Amino acid sequence: MADQRALDEVVEFTSELIRIDTSNRGGGDCRERPAAEYAAERLAGAGLDPLLLERTPGRTNVVARVAGTDPSADALLVHGHLDVVPAEAADWSVHPFSGEVRDGVVWGRGAVDMKNMDAMILAVLRGWARQGVRPRRDLVIAFTADEEASAEDGSGFLADRHPELFEGCTEAVGESGAFTFHDGTGREIYPVAAGERGTGWLRLTAGGRAGHGSKVNRENAVTRLAAAVTRIGEHEWPLRLTPTVRAALTELAALYGLEADFDDVALLLDKLGPAAKLVEATVRNSANPTMLDAGYKVNVIPG
């Protein structure tokens, strides 16, 4: 059981980690080291011996091992990432890097993804140290860099260059592994993450005929691009069920007394309520336009 001090530390650590701006815009501009040092200091306070590891200066990862009571048991990896996606202060009612506690809530970028979990990991380990608690199995604790971009400086680097640190790990709990599904009826579902969706980035470029904004132009590059982007955003890709997803759908259907229909998953998704968005992303590919850029002057049609 968590003591009150551990609960207070979760709030404190979340707030303080948020105040360390680790925005990852891609391109290697992020610096997680201050947050990594913060986490390492608190791990050391729990009697652990954390390692700080970098592929690129400033892109720091933290790894520590908690010895379990049963050396024959498989180890468990518990991990979180230290970087966050960027935030524009003008879009927030509370500054995104203030870590302000208001109305019983911690506000800021990372409060959900995922400095909150980083803080919980740290607080639990420190609480165990105070209470003299040891887990049955070894725990490998990892706080990684670069999750919000390529992961080349984070988990990719650790897996490629330091696999020995994860020796014996057979399962992991992280941002999505052991994620709880809530279907809106009070039912809690605990899925097992067996893999990740692949990712591809595409750049779509449209050309046209340049001209003055006061004249009709049926070869407008902006409207051509907008039409293409709309089609991409509205397109529903066909079902594509991997063997792992089929197994998951079979188990989910059984929870509701249904037979899994691999040709029509709509009924099952409807049963899942709020959790449907998480499951729907596993049954088909998807494409989302995220950035647009066009023109250079308000009265000039770009070519």
Feature-to-residue mapping (PLM):
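A generic structural motif
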Residues: 112, 147, 208-214, 296
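Acidic/His- and Gly-rich active-site-bordering loop/insert found
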Residues: 2-109, 118, 128-137
